[in-house]
Amino acid sequence: MRQPARTTIITLWGALITALALALSITAPAVAIDPGGREEALPTPPPPKPSVPSVGTTALSDGTPVGIVVAGGDGGMLHIVDLSTRTLRSRERLAPENTDVQPWEFARLSNRHVLLASGGGQLFEIDPDAPEGKKATNLSDPSRPGYEQVAAYSKFLWDVVVDEHDRVYVATQSDRGGHILRYDPSANQGRGQWTDLLPGGVQAGQTEVRSLAYDNGFLYAGTGTKTLSIVRINTSTNAATKLSVPSHVTAGLGHLERLQVKAGNLYVGTNVPGNVRPTCGGTCVLDPATGAQKMKDGKPIELDTWSSQVVTRPGEAEKVYYTVQSANTPTLQEYDPRTNTSRTLAEGLASTARPSQSSWATHDHFISAGKDDGSIAIVHASDRSAADLPKDANGSNGIRGSLRSIQSLTAVPGGDLYASWYMTTPMLLRTTPNAQVDKTQYSLTTAPLGQVEGFGHSSKWFVTGIYPSGELVTYEMGANGPRMEHPRSVKITTDASQVRPYTIVPIDADRFAVGTTPMGKNGSGALSIYDAARNEISTYPLDDIAYADPSLRGSLSNRRPLSIVHHKDKLYVGTSASGDGMNAAQTEAAAPRLFEFDVKTKQVTRVMTPFKDQRSITALTSGSDGTLYGTTGMHVFTVNPTDFTIGRSRALTRQGYADANRSQMIERDGVLYAIMAGRLRALSTSLQDDGTVIADFVNTPQGKVYVNSLTLGADRNLYYARGATIYRYTFPAG
């Protein structure tokens, strides 16, 4: 009888010890994982070809006419071009490192200084006579009176014009609507003054003002992305009138990119991408007071400008100018509205060079530039000649590209990395890492023009997703990486409604799942299945995708797929919140979704809302054991595919945030590596702690530079980018 009693006591002690151990495991703080690696910056990569969307002109203090050519990118590259001798006078960085410079349009002040409206949200004033390093001043600065009151409206600047009083008008884009900002450089004893010309925005519900034109006290603004309008504003009273523009003028356009006004004519660019003749041949001529189409001999006036901007010329009261291919020869054309005729002013311009609103420096000197290759065309009207800048032994005309922020990054079999940049370019960056970081090798490889939003690859294919053309460009995969010689392309949709192929995930050796989004922030995205072997694509817009359960119909509408993972003939897709993706309401109806798509039946089989208060499911990945992981930027979680439920979950309430943009997540040897809130974080797959930040964002005077574009190299190290630099996180040996 005594033995059983002893056994009972031992059993009770064991139970007590087990209970204590369990309690400690629950209450004791988990130790954050530390991979023990180190971060290394790879050498500075070569820049891509120059991005020159526009050019400016002015004269030096000695009267020399010059072109102001800025290559966009990280800090930008400022070139001063002598238009008389057709030579490059100087070249220097425009702005400090980590300044996003996108030179969309220029205008000239009466003091010969040039203004640059940058897509990075800055208005620069450039003095070409100033010493090196002192030529550019950023006027979009809190030290300028009124700027802090308008800063929220100036996230992106599209256009700039100047009136006869040197007052500056800037077209902007922002989440708070499209605005026109006015800057008066002479106010406040030369410190300037910023104001919002039309408080509340120019057009309700539209996020951008894309184009401006000014003449004789009236400002004209092309606004909208879904509903396009032209607004006429009296700059003395700020009274605004919407013009009655014929519907066919704006039909099919995503923006009103080009306006010009001269001598009682309002020129409106209408070019729609494609090979068909655009409305009015590219430019419609309207009455600037009413919006009615101008007529000549009973017929509408039309200019065959195709995609060219119509520009004015000093000393010409009525004529306007544009460039166009004539008999396969690039020409500069002069249009006289009095006779409704055009004549060739010069031939032999660079084929890609396009005019800007201030291309004419004088009545004799004209300059235009190629947006994506830096080619230059300088015209001397007096002898009707056109020429580029002199080329060196390497074929360069001296217009040098700027470093640019890395947009996307991937590692391929064989060990190389491929990267793309922010803003379009006809090339990719190939990186060959080395254990000794200073022996890293780079090369620039030719690729179709575009901005690569996403990469995907299998053992047989390398796929790139191109913006703004909305197409996939595919290369065969060789033993040492992709063979770049013979790319093939396919449009995701025939109507170009899906333009950003963000996410490309292999299903098998030949097929890929592709998640795409439309041009604007609003609107539904699409899920596509791409067969690379056949170069065929099937696209399923989320607004009308098929559901296995009819009761789910509509649950994905007005959302965009940002993350995809493939698991056992199913795709698990994470979306944005509905509408603009910001989920201000934080409701079930607006929240982001996670859905399951059957690759065989091409139907959505299950849908869930993991978190009502988040903006998107930014990344999904599959672990080595088949577990599915995801993140929203704040939450990290697992997904149980069997019953389609959320398993483990952890909220990083202190260092995470609900993100609206796609990111990346990788599982390596039982550890999750995810970009969250602009940081690279290592987390245990148990999700028992907040993990460890192994690569943080960097604070600079120009703002934060975030970590992005995470990929796992063939060497099993992590690679990612901050700005224009690629970094490696090297793990300890063994």
Language-model features, listed with the residues they occupy:
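Repeated scaffold domains used in trafficking and secretory/extracellular systems
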Residues: 49-59, 99-108, 150-161, 205-213, ...
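Residue-level signature of beta-propeller blades and closely related beta-rich strand-turn architectures
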Residues: 73, 120, 174, 225, ...
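A short loop-to-beta-strand structural motif that recurs across blades of beta-propeller domains
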Residues: 77-79, 122-124, 179-182, 229-231, ...
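Blade-level signature of beta-propeller repeat domains, shared across WD40, Kelch, NHL, RCC1
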Residues: 704-734
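Short, conserved, GDST-rich strand-edge loop motifs in beta-rich repeat architectures
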Residues: 270-281, 514-525, 574-591
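Surface-exposed loop and turn segments in beta-propeller and other repeat-based domains
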Residues: 44, 92-98, 137-151, 193-205, ...
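Conserved beta-propeller blade signature
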Residues: 66-70, 113-116, 167-171, 219-222, ...
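Secretory targeting and sorting signals
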Residues: 1-32
